């Protein structure tokens, strides 16, 4: 199975989620690649913690995603920051670039899963995940929900993984999010 993780990140929060997915698939012996979407307006943040600066630097060294990446993938993990209950403009632009594949349903049958970061539980992260799944459905892709049994006793949104940053820059993920990513990765390759 060829897995591509395609994400947009400004503060390195989504980069951390994407990287954790990447590492989880790698340790399970999967063929996985990590891509960031183009962000021509991105500027280096000055007043951020040192760990976040290092993560942002590493993120900027990743290859850019092209729509062709999706054609070459069996499973696509797509992630975007949540902006007003939606994906970022940069992720939407990336999605729109793939419109050429819609006419002939060239992405039909491929699996898609979603993740996002949001400032807090009221930040609209669920709506952002829904937008990624809506994109997948229009492209004929198979949307992969999070099973209710992923982590017994925990409430994980069925549309994907949400990392709540509480306005922090991408320094490290909380243990609950890390566990959810590990378990969801394992579920996706069954």
Where in this protein do the model-derived segments appear?
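N-terminal beta1-alpha1-beta2 submodule of the flavodoxin-like/Rossmannoid cofactor-binding fold
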Residues: 1-104, 151-190
């Amino acid at each position: 199975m060829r897995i591509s993780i395609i994400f947009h990140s400004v503060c390195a929060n989504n980069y951390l989620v994407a990287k954790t997915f990447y590492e989880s698939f790698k340790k399970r012996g999967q063929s996985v690649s990590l891509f960031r979407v183009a962000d021509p307006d991105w500027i280096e943040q000055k007043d951020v913690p040192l760990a976040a600066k290092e993560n942002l630097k590493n993120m900027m060294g990743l290859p850019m995603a092209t729509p062709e990446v999706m054609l070459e993938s069996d499973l696509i993990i797509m992630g975007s920051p949540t902006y007003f209950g939606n994906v970022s403009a940069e992720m939407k632009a990336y999605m729109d670039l793939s419109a050429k594949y819609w006419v002939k349903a060239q992405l039909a049958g491929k699996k898609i899963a979603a993740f996002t970061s949001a400032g807090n539980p009221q930040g609209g992260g669920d709506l952002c995940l829904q937008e990624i799944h809506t994109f997948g459905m229009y492209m004929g892709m198979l949307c992969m929900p999070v099973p209710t049994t992923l982590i017994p006793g925990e409430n994980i949104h069925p549309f994907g993984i949400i990392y709540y940053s509480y306005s922090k820059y991408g320094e490290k993920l909380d243990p609950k999010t890390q566990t959810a990513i590990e378990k969801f990765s394992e579920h996706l390759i069954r």
